């Protein structure tokens, strides 16, 4: 096929590994980041479908992971003078980003409220959880954004702080993988 012409003699796995996570669909990219973070936090992975991706029994912390390409049209405006390869070629839409993060935080609050005294982990075991009346339930929202978004770190942190004040969910912004060319 013509679209494979420049990959002749190259293993498909090598081509796939060079594809930025940010070129994948939202769902595919999100699942990949959840798997990656579950791998980085052994024994904390939660079974799919619970509304929570990680659970730390020691601190009674429920965590969910979402990815957000802040350079996508939904979350930023492209500055026509740039070529789209630098973060400075974009102006972030603060209110759109905040609305999305708040929706994620509210969904996490609902998911945690629906969890009783145990949660099924990704390895199939049931893990005991402490109810709010016994031990405070910490809620953390991890938002994975493109590496280049560090240019907007202060704005993103400001939004994260507002979400925590408004919802009680701590928001951690993490920067992974490049999304822009150049």
Residue ranges of predicted features:
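Catalytic toxin/effector domains delivered as secreted proteins or via bacterial secretion systems
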Residues: 3-182
């Amino acid at each position: 096929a013509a679209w494979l012409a420049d990959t002749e003699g190259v293993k498909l796995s090598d081509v796939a590994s060079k594809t930025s996570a940010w070129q994948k669909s939202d769902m595919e990219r999100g699942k990949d980041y959840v798997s990656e973070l579950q791998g980085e936090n052994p024994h904390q992975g939660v079974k799919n479908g619970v509304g929570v991706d990680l659970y730390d029994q020691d601190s009674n912390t429920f965590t969910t992971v979402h990815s957000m390409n802040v350079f996508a049209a939904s979350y930023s405006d492209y500055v026509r003078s740039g070529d789209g390869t630098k973060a400075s070629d974009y102006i972030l839409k603060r209110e759109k980003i905040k609305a999305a993060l708040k929706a994620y935080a509210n969904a996490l609050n609902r998911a945690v409220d629906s969890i009783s005294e145990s949660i099924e982990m990704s390895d199939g075991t049931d893990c005991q959880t402490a109810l709010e009346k016994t031990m405070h339930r910490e809620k953390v929202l991890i938002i994975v954004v493109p590496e280049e978004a560090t240019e907007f770190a202060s704005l993103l942190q400001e939004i994260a702080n507002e979400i925590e004040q408004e919802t009680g969910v701590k928001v951690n912004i993490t920067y992974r993988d490049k999304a822009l060319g150049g």
